[in-house]
Amino acid sequence: MTRPPLVRGIFSLGLSVAVLKGVEKTVRKHLERQGWIEPQKVDYELIFTIDRLKNLVDNKREALTAEQPDAGELSWRKVFNFISRQSSELDTRIYVLILLLSFLLPIAWTVLDGDRETTLEDKDNDCNVDLIENERRLKHYNDGERAVLQFGKNRSEPIILSYKDMNVLEGEHEFTSKEEHSNSHLTSKSENALNQVGSEDLLGCHLEKQLEEDKNEPNGEADGEDDNNREKDCSSSSEVESQSKCRKESTAEPDSLSRDTRTTSSLKSSTSFPISFKGSIDLKSLNQPSSLLHIQVSPTKSSNLDAQVNTEQAYSQPFRY
């Protein structure tokens, strides 16, 4: 396949050569009369007389044609004769100008067409470069930034990789901090009370074990020690009564403490700090320093109903709708 500019150049060159040959054939006689193609001996007087005679003949012909009405119809032969007659009377400078235009116009056409094609190719290359840069911009986020962008964040906004409650205002934030401080004070009081109850229950269990050991002792003692045993029994009975009173008080105190813990848990649930007690309260585990209350912080999720998810956000990391 040949290139289109080459075909156009060959066509324009052939056309210009054909025009040149035709012009040369039609104006050969006129050039000989004007002296462009000079013979070996030129008679200038004869040439001038011929021109004068020709002009006289032409003037007479025009006068005759003007007097006679044009009764004949227009035909292609008359048109061709008129064009040939007018072309034979043209100046040689007009012929030279026509030849130059026939050579230069095709060349200018090919040059301008080539510049247009290069501009279109440059525009296509610029568009491709812009698309590649946009694709690179879409892929420069890491995992943490993509996770933040999944929850309705725009790229124009600053990316915050740490948690920040966007729905709470500054005044509300101060109020919630005060409530958290008061709730922590209440939880510390309830923990101290539970520790005291646990210590009292441990003392009661220790005394019960001592009484059981006293009851299981052998009965092969002397009769003289019966009085002492009776006195011991009396003292032990008084101790048992005091222990039963302590137990009643201890049972009353956990009820009040359970109410306190309920109130504190309700306050904590309102401020999204729930205390999860599974089953009954294990006092021994509470007395140990390693066992602490498991406080689970549940941040408020921002509900953005107008958020839109694109393909990058959808395929970056799995998330919940």
Swiss-Prot record:
Write down the membrane topology: Single-pass membrane protein
Residues annotated as region TSC13-binding? 73-125
Q: What residue spans carry the Basic and acidic residues bias annotation?
A: 242-262
Q: Which UniProt keywords apply?
A: Autophagy, Membrane, Nucleus, Phosphoprotein, Signal, Transmembrane, Transmembrane helix
* Cell compartment(s), UniProt: Nucleus outer membrane
Region described as Disordered: spans on this chain: 211-275, 299-321
* Compositionally biased tracts (Low complexity): 263-272
- Give the range the annotation lists for the signal sequence: 1-22
What's a BP term from Gene Ontology annotated to this protein? protein localization
Q: According to the UniProt record, where is the region OSH1-binding?
A: 139-195
Question: Which spans are transmembrane here?
Answer: 94-114
Asked if the keyword Cell cycle belongs to this entry, the reply reads no
Where are the annotated segments for VAC8-binding? 233-321
List, alphabetically, the GO terms of the cellular component aspect. membrane; nuclear envelope; nuclear outer membrane; nuclear periphery; nucleus-vacuole junction
Q: Which residues carry this modification: Phosphoserine?
A: S156, S199, S285, S298
One MF term in the entry's GO annotations: structural molecule activity
Q: What is its main location?
A: nucleus
Q: Does the keyword Membrane apply?
A: yes
Q: What else is known?
A: Present with 1900 molecules/cell in log phase SD medium.
* Known partners and oligomeric status: Interacts with OSH1, TSC13 and VAC8.
Q: What does this protein do?
A: Involved in the formation of nucleus-vacuole junctions (NVJs) during piecemeal microautophagy of the nucleus (PMN). NVJs are interorganelle interfaces mediated by NVJ1 in the nuclear envelope and VAC8 on the vacuole membrane. Together, NVJ1 and VAC8 form Velcro-like patches through which teardrop-like portions of the nucleus are pinched off into the vacuolar lumen and degraded by the PMN process. Also acts as an outer-nuclear membrane receptor for OSH1 and TSC13.
Notes concerning its domains? The extended 80 Angstroms-longloop of NVJ1 specifically binds the highly conserved innergroove formed by the armadillo repeats of VAC8.
* Name recorded for this polypeptide: Nucleus-vacuole junction protein 1
The root-end lineage is: Eukaryota, Fungi, Dikarya, Ascomycota, Saccharomycotina
